[in-house]
Amino acid sequence: MVTYALLGATGATGSSILRHLLHESPDSLRIQILVRSKVKLLQAFPNLQTTRNPQVHVIQGTSTDPDALSECLRNASIVFMCVAQNGSPIGTTLCQDSARAIISVLQQQQQSQGASYQPCTIVQLRSASLNPALAAQVPAFVHRIVSFCLFANYADIKKACQYYSQAQKQGILEYILVDPPTLHDANGTQPTGYRLISTESQATALSYADLGAAMCEIAHRQSEFHGRAVGVTATGRVRQAWGVLLRHLLEGGSARLREKIAQETVVDGVVFAFLVVLAYLM
């Protein structure tokens, strides 16, 4: 039996993956789901507890709880990492903290299982903005604005990806990075068409339903993509809603601007104090 682990199943990405697996799952699949709120998950998927194909096991806990993670990751060949922070709050470390916790649990499994240990594949949601080939398709000024506004979120994701890369070199895991464009229609349930890409042209928008289907395809074809970034582009119509995205950009940009101003104020203060002391000594 194939076992998939899903972290963050109540968010838009995790829900789309779970919905796709429930409707088009491979034969003999077991899904181990880690969520902060089992009640919230069952409200979104009321038939989950009676589902027999695939088998579903729900664990309530956080993505940094070693006991919950150990139960969720046990025997998993695929780990969908969909835990994410809404917006881009300064100092966020959710992704990197989760990555460290996952790697720690996998290290323990590797040590206990010895030669029989089989590394799982982490399917990590990233962003086309962090993929040089795909980011180059966006006007430079737009890319700079987005990178500035979402600096904290991107820094967190990049650090998590560095941890996965280091762990791969140690034989602890494999990883695949999934790079979609802007994501829309969080409540939509029907995919309208997508395609996996490398450096080809990428549409501006993608639905969450198509992202979920794409991540499931990537998991099915995991051996083709180990250690690589995979882009996703829409081939069908996408119901676009820019309000939430623009709000995240505005909030992230405002926070980043305040941080920059505060840093410059501190530097100016230190320089001024140094000059005062220097003048006094002279």
From Swiss-Prot:
Source species of the chain: Aspergillus flavus (strain ATCC 200026 / FGSC A1120 / IAM 13836 / NRRL 3357 / JCM 12722 / SRRC 167)
Biological process per Gene Ontology, one example term: aflatoxin biosynthetic process
Top-rank lineage group of the source organism: Eukaryota
The protein's Enzyme Commission number: 1.-.-.-
Keyword Oxidoreductase assigned: yes
Uppermost EC category: oxidoreductase
Keywords: Oxidoreductase
Pathway recorded for this protein: Mycotoxin biosynthesis; aflatoxin biosynthesis
Record function comment: Involved in the conversion of averufin (AVF) to versiconal hemiacetal acetate (VHA) in the aflatoxin biosynthesis pathway.
Molecular function per GO: oxidoreductase activity, acting on the CH-NH group of donors, NAD or NADP as acceptor
Pfam families for the chain: NAD_binding_10
Family: Belongs to the avfA family.
UniProt-recorded name of the protein: Averufin oxidase A
